[in-house]
Amino acid sequence: MHYVGLAEMAAAVSNAGGLGIITGLTQGTPEKLANEIARCKEMTGKPFGVNLTFLPSLTPPDYPGLVNTIIQSGVKVVETAGNNPAKWMPQLKEAGIKVIHKCTSVRHSVKAQDIGCDAVSVDGFECGGHPGEDDIPNFILLPRAADELEIPFVASGGMADARSLVASLAMGAEGMNMGTRFIATKEAPVHDNVKQLSLIHISEPTR
């Protein structure tokens, strides 16, 4: 949800009873992230989290600064993605922050559990942006995750409505994670033409 998961989106989701997520790398710097977190707090008194995607790069973002900003801002949930977040776990856990790691396979989910993550977001091949290396759809992936994991997990990828939630719960998840579906909302800073296309081509948006 890069460039879409801003304060408006996160606050709306939290106010509706979900857990809204600000995309940390969208902000780019610790100072801008601190400002976005402050804006979100003005729009909701409910809990919300921040996503940090750890990517290999010759010129990486200021990850230490971003992590410190999250801690100093009092955010209590971080969704990590990309590289193994083990390096950051002691600092986050010491601050009392719950860590949800985004995984595209059962083996990565088990690894996240082993390093102390509180929960995982299990992303099937249906997800937008980063379906992983194995191309496993949720109908196969979620039941296997339920068999292997002791920590809670939410289902991600192709989730859009109440039917998605019922299916996720039936396959062992504790809930579901929606992303692409929210691009069509008024809170998304996306051109209306793109929103309309996502509604017309309702089965293809995550391709």
Model-predicted regions and their roles:
Residues 11, 139-143, 147, 166-167, ...:
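Residues on a specific face of well-ordered alpha-helices
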Residues 33-37, 185-199:
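C-terminal helical cap(s) of enzyme catalytic domains, especially alpha/beta-barrels
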Residues 151-152, 205:
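Short, proline-centered helix/strand-breaking motifs
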Residues 198-206:
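Residue-level detector of conserved catalytic or cofactor/ligand-binding positions
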Residues 3, 19-28, 122-132, 161, ...:
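Glycine-rich phosphate-binding active-site loops on the catalytic face of alpha/beta enzymes
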Residues 106-115, 148, 154, 159-176:
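Catalytic cores of alpha/beta
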Residues 1-149:
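Active-site entrance/lid segments in N-terminal catalytic domains of soluble metabolic enzymes
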